[in-house]
Amino acid sequence: MRCTSPAALVTFCAGLWISNHVLAQGLEAGVRSRADCEVCKEFLNRFYNSLLTRGIDFSVDTIEEELISFCADTKGKENRLCYYLGATKDSATKILGEVTRPMSVHMPTVKICEKLKKMDSQICELKYEKKLDLESVDLWKMRVAELKQILHSWGEECRACAEKHDYVNLIKELAPKYVETRPQTEL
């Protein structure tokens, strides 16, 4: 590409800078594709924001202690992420320093997850399970095994359930407790 004037070159460079800046803001604001490292990015963003709101000191030791306690309440894929990071008691490896050091200097969580991916690709292979919309799905058309899976994902169990309608009724009864009702934000 050949620029004929300095003004054209400045305009071109400014356009590149703005497009990269907007893309970076979009990645941080949640307008990103959820394909790569979704559990890592979501979890570390939530953890980082909880540290900010509580006014926690951003020292490496403090962040490590907070991460271990934050991981104590996790379930599912997030618990698996904590296991890979070494923040659970049964973890085989401990790579917490790869999270705490960059976070202590306020490195974006996207960059932290990219570094973790280079160390252990399993971290970025974690994906959240699809959320079940109980208002749109017909529970009566689901298999009993699928209904049991819904209860299991909620941490519930039905020992007295003998037939399908027992499971369906229990899910409908417990749904208000477990189904998130977030207001839809317009983009």
From Swiss-Prot:
Gene: Cdnf
Protein name: Cerebral dopamine neurotrophic factor
Keyword Disulfide bond: yes
Source organism of this protein record: Rattus norvegicus (Rat)
Primary residence: secreted
BP GO terms, sorted: dopaminergic neuron differentiation; neuron projection development
Superkingdom field: Eukaryota
Coiled-coil features, chain-numbered ranges: none
Listed GO CC annotations: endoplasmic reticulum; extracellular space
